[in-house]
From Swiss-Prot:
Keywords: Cytoplasm, Methyltransferase, rRNA processing, S-adenosyl-L-methionine, Transferase
Keyword Cytoplasm: yes
Protein name, as recorded: Ribosomal RNA small subunit methyltransferase J
Disulfide bond sites: none
Coiled-coil stretches: none
Reaction equations catalysed: guanosine(1516) in 16S rRNA + S-adenosyl-L-methionine = N(2)-methylguanosine(1516) in 16S rRNA + S-adenosyl-L-homocysteine + H(+)
UniProt GO molecular function: rRNA (guanine-N2-)-methyltransferase activity
Pfam families to which the protein is assigned, alphabetical: SAM_MT
GO cellular component assignments: cytoplasm
Length: 250
């Protein structure tokens, strides 16, 4: 994949070249999208819109930490949707990981989550965030145990994952209407990088074959059901719904 690669660390140790080789990235000086290695983290920037700032994954501080400490925990809609109840903490495959927010919420309340991400740049951002999270004294021990990244396309990986999870979680990219600054910023950068999930409808059937108990699909409230497959079961929040489909018992 072509992207502009920028090293702002000043270290001169070739770490960016190693990272590019690992994720199959080729430097393109004219590309408006840039993957930037700073001394603190890896960032994705849209060079023709510098005011948007950098997109990065941070499980330790900022919004993720606030959500972990002060969010709803088990009461969050995503936790209810995957079926967390009492001592039951399902094994989850998040087949459209993105920046890992929902996967992190599930891991923070005790679920073991395997994240799938096919875009190499997004996977690199996730991997960088995980590496820093794993080193953190407070969350590192349980994060290492509960949250893992698999760089693969869900369309193929969902046929081959073992052991089978209790739940497959899907949150395909869908054009957002919301006007919040964060969503606008992230979606503009993300959609410039990866575009819409045009093949997302093809995920539901393999997800239902893989999941032992259920498949959960997060949708904006104005979006049709994935693949136009309606379900009467959903957890509904302001702005979103989590459609729930049966899996395939072991």
């Amino acid at each position: 994949m072509n992207i502009c690669l920028i090293d702002e660390t000043g270290a001169g140790d070739g770490a960016l070249s190693v990272l590019a080789a690992r994720w199959g990235l080729t430097h393109d000086a004219d590309n408006p999208m840039a993957l930037v290695m700073t001394s603190a983290r890896l960032e994705l920037r849209k060079r023709d819109e510098p005011k948007l700032g950098g997109i990065f994954v941070d499980f330790v501080e900022g919004a993720m930490a606030h959500r972990r400490k002060f969010g709803g925990g088990r009461g969050e809609a995503v936790a209810k949707a995957v079926g967390i109840k009492g001592s039951y903490l399902p094994q989850v495959v998040d087949a459209t990981a993105g920046l890992g927010r929902d996967a992190f919420v599930l891991a923070s309340v005790g679920c073991h989550v395997r994240m799938l991400e096919r875009n190499p740049v997004v996977a690199a951002l996730l991997d960088d965030g995980l590496a820093r999270g794993y080193q953190d004294a407070e969350i590192g021990p349980w994060l290492r145990e509960r949250l893992q990244l698999i760089h693969a396309s869900s369309l193929t990986a969902l046929e081959a994952i073992t052991p089978r999870p209790d739940v497959v979680y899907l949150d395909p990219m869908f054009p957002h209407k919301q006007k919040s600054a964060l969503v606008k910023k992230e979606m503009r950068v993300f959609q410039s990088l990866v575009g819409p999930d045009l093949d997302a409808d093809g995920l539901l059937a393999p997800a239902r074959r893989l999941a032992i108990k259920r498949v959960v699909v997060k949708r904006p409230d104005y979006a049709p059901p994935l693949g136009d497959v309606a379900t009467p079961n959903a957890v509904v929040t302001k702005g979103h719904r989590f459609d729930i489909y049966t899996g395939t018992p072991a």
